[in-house]
Amino acid sequence: MSVKELIVNAGSSSLKYTVFRMPEQEVLANGIFEQLTTPKPTFTHKLPNESGKLVKVIEKEPLAPYATHADAINTLIETLTGKKFGVLSSMDEIAAVGHRVLHGGEKFSGSVLVTESVKEAIRECIPLGPLHNPANLMGIEVCEKIMKGIP
């Protein structure tokens, strides 16, 4: 049985994402929010064409000045479930959200289910990845808040 997963890579001023159909590893959509929290953030969204090649359907779409990661996640949900460029009928189709975290220190070398203790361990590793780990953690927390109930 196929499931859909949303993979998120939250950076200090960006948010990259891909929606996969698993276990086929089929890319249903991907994109990036760039220059978040600046005067001119943008959004690019790609969908596969008939041959499966990803093509830009939204390119460098301006967002509200100083848009946050939470704003980006909300725009992402609207886009993924929208009639024009959506690939989901609702977020209920997402079985899980995966997050890229730069540095897990000696605590993590592979995938884990995010719990409060995992988030605390990511915080403890901030000295190992001071630019990325705070943003990665913030991405996890924003997704948890906005996409309640999705692991």
Language-model segment annotations:
Residues 118, 122-151:
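Active-site neighborhood for divalent-cation/phosphate handling
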Residues 2-46:
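Gly/Thr-rich phosphate-binding beta-strand-loop-beta motif of the actin/hexokinase/Hsp70
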Residues 2-3, 92-93, 147-151:
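Short coil/turn connectors at secondary-structure junctions
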Residues 27-95:
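Contiguous, glycine/small-aliphatic-enriched amphipathic segments in soluble metabolic enzymes
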Residues 10-11, 100-101, 136:
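Fold-independent oxyanion-binding glycine-rich loops
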Residues 69, 80, 84-131:
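Short beta-strand-loop/turn "lid" adjacent to the catalytic site in phosphate-handling enzymes
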Residues 15, 72, 76, 93, ...:
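General structural feature for long, well-ordered alpha-helical segments within catalytic domains
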